[in-house]
């Protein structure tokens, strides 16, 4: 019988990585990463293309082969069955593919599958409804998923993850296909889930979103952890310029004092 998770106190480790390494063929993608993610926080993973962000997220979720130690909910990753792991972590993949024309409601309901046959299956209707409201998809629940726009599909996929109601959310570029309003909506949902006790790890390409919404930022470079800490300590012009190999400027926001991050651009009008 699958062992359900127990409630964790605020600040408890939700995932602990020690010496995490991964290869793809002859190329080292992750090299000795040590990282702890705690309940109640939003941790943003940033870095240039190929830095190892998605691989790290997949390794934490148990979907990418790796060496080193991964501990989820106080026990080694390999000690959990597939169902037990699905009760503890939910993964939003970078790309969502469905071979059949499931409706939006059916896709979101898939997030409840780990709880089938447990007392928590009584929460299915509430969890599905809450997730669809949070992501703004209640207006098209009967539409086939393949017929949706890219942004709509992204929000439905996130709703499925939220409906799973796990203590650890692993989100790979949750805002990549979204406009500005829906980006802010998604991170509002993420912040509320963290405030309610979840641990959230999100791969984010938009450094401004990471600076504005993350409690901590982990910067990956060449498969290694270059820095990890609060946004105002980690997202500095020298480090980002080195990591992205492009001149970066960082300013404090006049109202929030959070870092505002921009690529350095020549002054004056753009050249024709």
Language-model regions: role of each:
Residues 46-48:
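The feature captures the beta-strand-to-loop junction immediately N-terminal to the Walker
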Residues 169-173:
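Catalytic Walker B motif of ABC-type/P-loop ATPase nucleotide-binding domains
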Residues 61:
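Helix-to-loop junction immediately C-terminal to a conserved catalytic motif
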Residues 66-76, 85:
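Conserved ABC transporter NBD signature motif
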Residues 122-140:
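Conserved ABC ATPase "signature" region
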């Amino acid at each position: 019988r699958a062992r359900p998770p127990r409630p964790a106190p605020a600040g408890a480790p939700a995932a602990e990585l020690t010496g995490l390494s991964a290869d793809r063929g002859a190329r080292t993608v992750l090299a000795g990463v040590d990282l702890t993610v705690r309940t109640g926080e939003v941790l943003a993973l940033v870095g240039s293309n190929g830095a190892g962000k998605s691989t790290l997220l997949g390794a934490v979720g148990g979907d990418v082969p790796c060496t080193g130690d991964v501990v989820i909910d106080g026990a080694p990753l390999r000690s959990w069955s597939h169902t037990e792991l699905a009760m503890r972590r939910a993964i939003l993949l970078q790309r969502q593919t469905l071979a059949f024309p499931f409706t939006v409601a059916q896709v979101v309901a898939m997030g409840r599958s780990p709880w089938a046959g447990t007392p928590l299956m009584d929460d299915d209707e509430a969890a599905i409804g809450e997730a669809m409201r949070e992501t703004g998809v209640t207006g098209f629940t009967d539409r086939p998923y393949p017929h949706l726009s890219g942004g709509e599909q992204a929000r439905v996929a996130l709703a499925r993850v939220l409906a799973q109601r796990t203590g650890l959310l692993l989100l790979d570029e949750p805002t990549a296909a979204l406009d500005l309003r829906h980006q802010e909506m998604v991170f509002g949902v993420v912040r509320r889930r963290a405030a309610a006790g979840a641990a959230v790890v999100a791969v984010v390409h938009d450094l401004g979103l990471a600076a504005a919404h993350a409690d901590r930022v982990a910067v990956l470079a060449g498969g290694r952890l270059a820095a990890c800490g609060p946004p105002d300590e980690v997202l500095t012009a020298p480090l980002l310029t080195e990591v992205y190999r492009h001149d970066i400027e960082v300013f404090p926001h006049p109202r929030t004092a959070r870092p505002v991050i921009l690529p350095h651009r020549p002054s004056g009008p753009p050249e024709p």
